[in-house]
Amino acid sequence: MSGAPLDDKDRALVAAARDAIRQRYRNEWQEVGAALRTRDGRIITGVNIDAYLGRMAVCAEAVAIGRAITEAGDQGIDTIVAVRHPKPGETDQSIAVVSPCGSCREIIYDYDAKARVIVPNGDEPAVATIAELLPNKYVRGSGRW
């Protein structure tokens, strides 16, 4: 992973994701917020949609991507980030950057193979490319694994 440091635009994107989950947090239901910046500069946010049946849940990144397509058209994903809101009883109450799960890595790559992803990296988040986070991606119909 390249682990490039965040610039001001990246920090603003993290702040947008934090604001989204801070406004919509519901313990056991909405715990993750995401924000993406389209290639034309728009910032779109989303929060996860949890469900009693876990496999029915939808990640915050997927919600943000769906909103971006609906509201902005397919402009591509310049950068995306997800953050997790702590539960009330947790010692650390900071809203922290989290890595996208495997399914989210797949969908981010599917919608923009050149997307930048803000990920945890020790004390400070860093930027990686989706290709770095999902090497050797399977491409349907290519015979490639």
Q: Where are the regions a protein language model picked out?
A:
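C-terminal binding/interaction regions
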Residues: 2-27, 66, 71-145
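Short beta-strand scaffold segments in enzyme catalytic cores
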Residues: 31-38
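Fold-independent oxyanion-binding glycine-rich loops
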Residues: 39, 47, 60, 120-122, ...
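Short acidic, glycine/proline-rich loop/turn micro-motifs
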Residues: 46-49, 91
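Compact, glycine-rich, soluble single-domain proteins
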Residues: 48-62
